[in-house]
């Protein structure tokens, strides 16, 4: 199936008089494997279910959201690939004018708190519906327990309490949504399906109890305790179920879905995707996001970097789920054979490109360690890093007919390259020689060790060593390529002096004037956001300076980008 239906006429052409599942998304309908709603929808179709999709429905009117009719089984609501509040506002709470996932690029289609809006629209325009409303995607996933909301500067209830929904599917949703669809179809109990949350009047036996919502409101230390327990119970092997009381009911979080095998990953990414905007939405204008992802290929999911400001470990998991080389090669061959393909693959990667195929054997058997991280403060000895598999893959991809260039645009952990004594240099040389164009983007995020420690990242000595190796190999290859650096201003603990020191180090040691500086955004369910709200280091309980004035946050950024050079 090239496209999921979004009109009655398309349903008729498929011979359907109704659908089983109605997907509703805050993004326009891009039919690619980078669209979570589409992945889930096509996975359900692969298993015999009829699925339709409504993208960016008009709010306050029934015409859009009801045009495919009521589904037989459930509604599946997502705010989109990006949290709707992050999509709509900058780190200093200014309204964004552009949206790369909206036709025409104007940010006028995605409502604030899209999951809540769409769920309420279903209750309003499908009056008396008995079909389940399931919320999913990153916006729901990261708000599944009591969470800090930056945009209102307060703790909010688990999103199920506000959304008027029945079920929350968290993390990677293909398997849990398929199991739910089968259970509802067969009239079976769904409340033990992994990867789901729901509300109950009673606690669930043998599940861990988090501090209640009211206890979190009363004492920030309770909120820290709740988050620690929540974070430690995200591993598919070791996690226990969780309960959290809110008012007179409980949020029940079942343990996470199992990590996907290579076979399942291959099946998911072997499904047919149009790699285009659905014609119904295409006529509304160009979609900028397509330029980046149309010819990009996912190699794996998950990340064990566990940077404190990042939610990938909570959403995709700390265990790497990789596709086989043959599956990736086959996808690139298919792309290379399409009529309008220009010869360049925009990206081959995942959350962290060079974690493909690299996982700790102990973790795969026993689950993630509860008392240490894989890469911080130093790489664990149990994690054997060898980039040979990735070099082999890249060489295979380069040989495919009609391929001019395979780019790696996903992030790369340069500390892992340095830790790989066997193939790290070979991998870096391969990247520099054939897989970047003019510059390589890396994300040290800061240069001051105190701030890097709060971020959960390596010290700057690692950055310096990598920089030297990068330019050494460039010189050997006769290339004039550069490193560019992603940096963060106003992270909890960071003061003006830290940004001045960063600026000095960047100028004197890195020999750059940084431009890629973003202000820290406290998104739900990260340790850095926990620091921002509590003004404490949650690992030491020590008090932290946290810059909360938006003007002063901007000043921290400007110190590095020199926009206030002539100001007092």
UniProtKB/Swiss-Prot annotation:
Its cofactor is [4Fe-4S] cluster. It comes from the Bacteria. Keywords: 4Fe-4S, Iron, Iron-sulfur, Metal-binding, S-adenosyl-L-methionine. It holds the Pfam family Radical_SAM_N. Transmembrane segments: none annotated. Residues 546-568 are annotated as: Disordered. Binds 1 [4Fe-4S] cluster. The cluster is coordinated with 3 cysteines and an exchangeable S-adenosyl-L-methionine. SUPFAM superfamilies: Radical SAM enzymes. GO terms for molecular function: 4 iron, 4 sulfur cluster binding; catalytic activity; iron ion binding. Disulfide bonds: none annotated. Belongs to the UPF0313 family. PANTHER family: UPF0313 PROTEIN YGIQ. This is UPF0313 protein FN0734. It comes from Fusobacterium nucleatum subsp. nucleatum (strain ATCC 25586 / DSM 15643 / BCRC 10681 / CIP 101130 / JCM 8532 / KCTC 2640 / LMG 13131 / VPI 4355).
């Amino acid at each position: 199936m090239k496209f999921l239906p979004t009109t009655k006429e398309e349903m008729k052409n498929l011979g359907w008089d109704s659908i089983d599942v109605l997907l509703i998304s805050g993004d326009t309908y891009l039919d690619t494997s980078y669209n979570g709603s589409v992945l889930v929808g096509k996975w359900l179709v692969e298993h015999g279910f009829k699925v339709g999709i409504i993208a960016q429905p008009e709010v306050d009117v029934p015409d859009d959201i009801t045009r495919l009719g009521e589904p037989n089984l459930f509604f599946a609501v997502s705010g989109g690939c990006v949290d709707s509040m992050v999509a709509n506002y900058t780190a200093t709470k200014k309204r964004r004018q552009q949206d790369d996932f909206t036709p025409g690029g104007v940010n006028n289609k995605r409502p604030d708190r899209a999951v809540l809006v769409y769920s309420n629209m279903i209750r309003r325009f499908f009056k008396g519906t008995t079909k389940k409303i399931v919320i999913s995607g990153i916006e729901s996933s990261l708000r599944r327990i009591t969470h800090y909301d930056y945009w209102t500067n307060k703790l909010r209830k688990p999103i199920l309490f506000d959304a008027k929904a029945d079920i929350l599917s968290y993390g990677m949703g293909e398997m849990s949504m398929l199991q739910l669809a089968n259970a509802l179809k067969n009239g079976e109990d769904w409340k033990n399906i992994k990867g789901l949350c729901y509300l109950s009047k009673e606690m669930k036996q043998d599940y861990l109890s988090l501090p209640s919502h009211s206890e979190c409101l009363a004492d920030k230390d309770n909120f820290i305790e709740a988050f620690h327990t929540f974070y430690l119970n995200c591993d598919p092997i070791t996690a226990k179920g969780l309960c959290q009381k809110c008012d007179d009911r409980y949020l029940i979080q079942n343990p996470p879905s199992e990590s996907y095998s290579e076979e399942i990953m291959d099946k998911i990414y072997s499904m047919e995707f149009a790699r285009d905007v659905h014609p119904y939405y295409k006529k509304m204008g160009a979609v900028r996001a397509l330029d980046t992802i149309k010819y990009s290929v996912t190699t794996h999911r998950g990340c064990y970097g566990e940077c404190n400001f990042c939610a990938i470990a909570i959403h995709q998991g700390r265990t790497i789920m990789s596709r086989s080389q043959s599956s990736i090669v086959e996808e690139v061959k298919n792309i290379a054979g399409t009529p309008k393909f220009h010869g360049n693959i925009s990206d081959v990667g995942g959350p962290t490109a060079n974690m493909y195929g690299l996982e700790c054997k102990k973790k795969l058997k026993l689950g993630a360690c509860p008392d240490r991280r894989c890469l911080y403060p130093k790489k664990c000895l149990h994690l054997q890093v060898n980039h040979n598999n990735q070099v082999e893959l890249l060489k295979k991809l380069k040989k495919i007919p009609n391929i001019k260039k395979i780019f790696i645009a996903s992030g790369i952990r340069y500390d892992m390259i340095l830790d790989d004594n066997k193939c790290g240099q070979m991998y870096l040389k391969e990247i520099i020689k054939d897989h970047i164009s003019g510059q390589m983007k890396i994300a040290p995020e800061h240069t001051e060790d105190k701030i890097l420690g709060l971020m959960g990242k390596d010290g700057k000595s690692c950055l310096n060593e990598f920089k030297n190796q990068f330019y050494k190999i460039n010189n050997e290859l006769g290339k004039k390529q550069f490193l560019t650096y992603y940096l963060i201003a106003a992270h909890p603990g960071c003061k003006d002096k830290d940004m001045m020191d960063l600026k000095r180090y960047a100028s004197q040691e890195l020999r750059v004037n940084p431009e890629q500086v973003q202000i820290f955004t406290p998104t739900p369910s990260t340790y850095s956001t926990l620091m921002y709200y509590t003004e404490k280091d949650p690992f030491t309980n020590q008090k932290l300076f946290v810059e909360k004035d938006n003007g002063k946050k901007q000043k921290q950024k400007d110190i590095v980008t020199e926009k206030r050079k002539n100001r007092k």
